[in-house]
Amino acid sequence: MRHISKEWNNGASLIENQFRRLVSLCVLYLAQGLPAGFTYVAFVAYLSDNGTPPEDIAILFATIALPWTFKFVWGPVIDLLVIPEFGRRRPWILFAQSGMVISLATILFVPNIIDKIALVTVLLFIHNLFSSLQDVSVDALAVDVLQPDEVAKANGMMFATKRGGMIIGGAVLGMLVPDFGIKFVIMIQIPLLILIMLLPLFLREKPGNKLFPWENSESEIVKPKEVVLNSEEGTLLAWKENDDLRFRGA
């Protein structure tokens, strides 16, 4: 435990700390897998068990898949609209996670989920819209902060944690539905997603980034074209100019 704490505190930003960047990327992917597993497994099983027509379930599946089909649209958007002083990707990740929480919480106010399946489908579409935005933003963050020799390991770890989140959301939470109800299971996910959101809220991407608007920058923001040495290994960082790093998100 002491070793983990030491690794976490070794360097203030993701660029400076390998342990922080790997853990952060994996936890953010867990946040995507949790509601995805719930939606595609537990929620669909609940609908089927309560007599929802197959055609309504098919429409639900098709609708929530749309944001993922066209998520390539997010790439140019998050590259174009940036607030460098807070990190290039961090504001987008926080925005996406906030949208995921709000859209999921809104379902709690639907009086009868079975009777209002069309409304729930719209809300889950919005939820997946924000989830796909987080997916693209986290992948972009990985490209920015990972070093070339970390990419394969990070990609595998991120894929595994997302699938782990899907197992928790689908199987574990699904087993709670018969005893506690579907809305109780949704309520469990909301604080979990909020807790995960605290991670990027208090982490800097690069030295000099501000966490909040009222905070003074610790130092001048490092420009991407500058060659910077990793304090841990003395190797060039993956976000320097003209890097040939390639990353594929899970």
Predicted feature descriptions by range:
Residues 86-93, 116, 175-193:
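A membrane-interface helix-boundary motif in multi-pass transporters
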Residues 76-81, 108-112, 168-187:
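Transmembrane alpha-helix termini and helix-breaking/packing motifs in multi-pass membrane transporters
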Residues 93-115:
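C-terminal ends and interior cores of transmembrane alpha-helices
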Residues 126-161:
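Cytoplasmic helix-loop-helix junction between adjacent transmembrane helices
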Residues 204-249:
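Flexible cytoplasmic inter-helical loops of multi-pass small-molecule transporters
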Residues 95-102, 184-202:
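Symmetry-related core transmembrane helices of the 12-TM Major Facilitator Superfamily/SLC fold
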Residues 7-68:
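Helix-loop boundary and gating motifs at the non-cytosolic
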Residues 67-71, 152-177:
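Glycine-rich segments within core transmembrane alpha-helices of 12-TM secondary carriers
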